[in-house]
Amino acid sequence: MKKNNYFYFLIFLFLNLFFLPVKSDPIFELGKTIFLEQGNCAVCHTLTDAKSSGQIGPNLNQLKPNMTRIIYAVTNGIGVMPSYEGQLTIQEIEAVAHYVSLSANQ
């Protein structure tokens, strides 16, 4: 019986480590806060994790952008989206890129 319990524990541990999204990451949490409050991203963009349903910018769940693409768009602006280079630090831009790339690619 103990071997059975050990086996199930290992399966549980494996599933938690490799298949559940990591959301206790402080950079992830900072990025989420910026997305929702400071950057006003949620006003224009749809992202399930943020419970946002903006209709102006692209749906990030469908776009599934990587960090490089997000950093470029936030830093330089793209289309009707303005640049946030003067409003956010590079660390804040990287944090929001980290958050969006992980959330959109779940």
Please report, for each region that a protein language model flagged, where it lies by residue:
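Terminal low-complexity/IDR "tail" segments
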Residues: 50-51
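Residue-level signal for beta-strand positions within conserved beta-sheet cores that form or flank
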Residues: 20, 40, 56
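Extracytoplasmic electron-transfer domains, predominantly the class I c-type cytochrome c fold
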Residues: 54-106
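Post-cleavage N-terminal segment of exported redox proteins
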Residues: 1-29, 73-74, 87, 98-106
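Generic hydrophobic-segment detector
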Residues: 21, 44-47, 67
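Sequence/structural segment immediately N-terminal to covalent heme-attachment motifs in c-type
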Residues: 26-47, 62, 76
